[in-house]
Amino acid sequence: YMTYTELSKNFDVGELAIYRTYGLCTVEGMEEMNGLEYLRLHSNEDDSAVLVPLTNAEELGLRHLSSKDTVEKALTILSDSSLPVREDWKQRLNENKSLMKTGTLDSVAKVVNCLYRRSKVKALPAMEKKIYESALSLLLEEACIVLGKDNREMRKIVFSRLENV
């Protein structure tokens, strides 16, 4: 576990960070409530404030932006046709939810790969479509910033990789 001082040294006010399901957030500062210390984030997606308890921020999926190498690796995952796509939608749903919970860009790319390929065979059920859209959005958002590309340009890259499957 990181101590409060380690975490506060790790994230600077104004820094962009990724917080699992919220995606891209801006670090706004520290707050203390009821004796617990929190990192205050601003969600760029829905313009809301998010408090992350410092004691388990990492387990909750708070992380720094990925490196260019990590983004490139995630983009490579998009064209990996050897990744399994389960027939049983409940198994697929649980696996993809677990992958999304890890919050890593690799995991997000695996979800995009799996559900994109599945959608080419059969329309996705509503819950899976929502996970797919969320994963795609997270991938695009982080890749755009790290690689310095706009959304339209990044979508072209992502879908050309997916189409190569």
Protein language model features and the residues they cover:
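Charge/polar-rich, low-complexity and marginally structured segments
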Residues: 57-165
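A positional/architectural concept
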Residues: 1-62
